[in-house]
Amino acid sequence: MSVIKQLFSKLSSLKFKRKTAIQKETTAQIDILKNKGFEVLSVTKTEKANLIMYRHFLDDIPEEEEIRIFIGISVITSKGRSGRDPMLKAFFKNNFTTISLEDIEMADSFINQGLGSMLLNALLDIAKKRNIRRITGEISRVDIGHIERLVHFYEKHNFEVILCSDSADVYKIGDLVWNRS
């Protein structure tokens, strides 16, 4: 066998081993999530990772009575599970007629990879399934350093972004509103 064929053979073998390792870790993480009572919403395979989107339910509360909404994404690479899971936090209010979006938490290493869109789309799916017509939220003052990116992100998902003209508010710099059409 030529040297080039040997190199390609070894490279193919390494790729297969990485894919197998990612798949095994993905299966293990799915089992862990299900054993904790989480609902696995989807598993997405990308070139470099598997993404397990899940919803965290609190113990002994039926889904239709659950006020809190926690949606996370476990990122599995060939090195294992990648750090803290990106997480969306929201809650139902006004007798389950509105959702209030609290936060989308994400490590810098996950920004601009589509994970925030996946989380927000999952929340929008919940709103549509539950016939929720409105989602509200605030843009926190801690996000002022990347406000342009946030405005683009929320407008891309059909949210109205209302930036505050009053700089005296120490907690927020804007409001978010999504109305189901």
Regions found by a protein language model. Give the residues of each.
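Short histidine/acidic/glycine/proline-rich micro-motifs that form metal-
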Residues: 140-144
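Non-catalytic substrate-recognition and accessory regions of acyl/acetyltransferase enzymes
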Residues: 1-111, 121, 125-138, 148, ...
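Glycine-rich phosphate-binding loop
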Residues: 114
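Residues forming the Rossmann-fold NAD(P)(H) cofactor-binding site
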Residues: 117
